[in-house]
Amino acid sequence: MKLKFSKHTSERKVNRLKKKIRIRKTVKGTAERPRLCVFRSGKHVYAQIINDVDGNTLVAVSSLGKEDKSGIDMAKLVGMEAAKAATAKNIKDVVFDRNGYLYHGRVKSLADGAREGGLNF
């Protein structure tokens, strides 16, 4: 797959997107074991549980509107909330997709929160 970027795209973003494509070649979500995808912006963290076979999102959770905590603590709460919503839909096993980000900080905290909430990776 050939990627096209504008000349203003930062090298850091280009490298993350290349990593994302490499990871997505191996990480696929199914109906029995969907994919837990993480996205982090400058202020917020988003988590989705996706069935790639049907192409639909089963659960979506974010830190928008939850301003009482920030950073790592908020990411952990988002992970626990995603796990709670997933177990309500009888989802216990997921594949973790870090989306090209390093497994560190908010991404790791979200994964730990999801594990504490009852999801198995």
Swiss-Prot record:
CDD domains, A to Z: Ribosomal_L18_L5e (cd00432)
Top-rank taxon: Bacteria
Role noted for this protein: This is one of the proteins that bind and probably mediate the attachment of the 5S RNA into the large ribosomal subunit, where it forms part of the central protuberance.
Organism the protein comes from: Bdellovibrio bacteriovorus (strain ATCC 15356 / DSM 50701 / NCIMB 9529 / HD100)
Organism lineage: Bacteria, Pseudomonadati, Bdellovibrionota, Bdellovibrionia, Bdellovibrionales
Keywords: Ribonucleoprotein, Ribosomal protein, RNA-binding, rRNA-binding
Record Gene3D superfamilies: 3.30.420.100
Quaternary structure (record): Part of the 50S ribosomal subunit; part of the 5S rRNA/L5/L18/L25 subcomplex. Contacts the 5S and 23S rRNAs.
InterPro entries for the chain: Ribosomal_uL18_bac-type, Ribosomal_uL18_bac/euk
Name the record gives this protein: Large ribosomal subunit protein uL18
Entry GO CC: cytosolic large ribosomal subunit
Similarity-based family: Belongs to the universal ribosomal protein uL18 family.
Pfam families on file: Ribosomal_L18p
GO biological process: translation
An example molecular function term from Gene Ontology annotations: 5S rRNA binding
